[in-house]
Amino acid sequence: MFSVEAPKIKFGNGVLNELGEDAKSLGMRRVAVFTDRIVAEQESLTIAVNSLEKAGIECEIYDEVEVEPTDRSFKAGSRFASEGKFDGFVSVGGGSVMDTCKASNLYSCFPSEFLDYVNAPIGKAKPAPGPLKPHIACPTTFGTASECTGIAIFDLLDMEAKTGIVSPRLRPDLGLLDPLSLKTLHPMIRAANAFDVFSHACESLTARPFTHRQAPDHPSRRPLSQGANPYSDIACLEAIQLVGENLIQAVHDPEDENLEALMFAGMLAGIGFGNAGCHLPHGMSYAVAGLCKDYQPDGWSSDHALVPHGISVIVNSPAVFRFTGSACEERHFQAAKAMGAETQGASMEDGGSLLSDQLIKMMKDTGIPNGLQGVGYGRDDLENLTERSYAQKRLIDNAPCPVSREQMKGLFEDSFSYW
């Protein structure tokens, strides 16, 4: 069996103007508004704060969120949340902002040692003890779908590892998805976001089926990531189709309808992977991001080297889907066709290769780095990348086929350069 966890979403141009009344309906009177220093200078935050104040809600802005957040960022946000005596939270920004807000809500409501709630094996993976304060997420990007999920991802600095906190309690009470918020995004951020959407959707579509998982010893212990299931399949296939139809134009010459379609695709993919879960590309991405040396991406404002999440995922994806293609041929074929691959005369068993080739073509067309080499890694880094990634048991076990350590190293070798 599988269960369905569905987020509450409002979608459409101008929906951010309704934030104040939505916050009031959730009982908010004094809220913490989480954002970052880039979004703090943009119209989206002004609209959000004006709407809150118009509804008579007191708000205090926290704009210290780090891009690609760290445990340091989560802890700082949690201190702010604990000291402010807030009765609700609003996040205005991308996945980094929403994830930091989720974690700050958790630790301010239920203080604990930091690693207590963090995923095993790094942390103790303790469940949230009870309900959190209401949280309205207002994304200004469309890749992470953090407004749809109970997941908060961060870099653990001491271990140079990316990990996260997973709990249904973290899922925001409401997401306000306003495509007008996307107009100021840099083209490379749009590209990385779109490939992240694709990866969420395709990994969920090709994940180990829910029918192949052992039932939990108690219904309350059924994980959020249940594997591919009919509910997620519908959302994920549509999300892949929308990315395939809109990605190239959205990067080079976007119209409003392209941005609206991609934000909707991000929402669908978030609903899909929020129930099915991701697998190898995301499992491998954490090491790619966490061990970054000196890569400085075009379009991101950061004072340190980083591999943005969407890029850290997609540089592995062509190699992975070529590898997993034989595990569920029809699903890979469907994904390739939805992304725009030429499938006439091809057979189902070609699905993995067709999908891989189409991804490489679209990566080149949108300026995505050429594999691991393109984000600053050398072949002498592959062993360390493998070691860090193979520990991501939650994601690795969700793959459609077993993966040995040597096979994972082979995937990193195949991801080194594509053209």
Mark where each language-model region is.
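C-terminal charged capping/lid subdomain of soluble metabolic enzymes
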Residues: 332-419
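ATP/NTP phosphate-donor binding region
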Residues: 1-88, 372
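Glycine/serine-rich anion-binding loops at beta->alpha junctions
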Residues: 86-104, 140-147, 279
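Short Gly/Thr/Asp-enriched flexible loops that form oxyanion-binding sites at enzyme active sites
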Residues: 47-48, 76-78, 97-111, 148
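Active-site segments that bind and position negatively charged phosphate/pyrophosphate groups
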Residues: 211-352, 357
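Generic secondary-structure signature for well-ordered alpha-helical cores
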Residues: 24, 53-57, 82-83, 106-109, ...
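A glycine/threonine-rich phosphate-anchoring loop and its flanking beta-alpha core
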Residues: 110-224, 327, 334
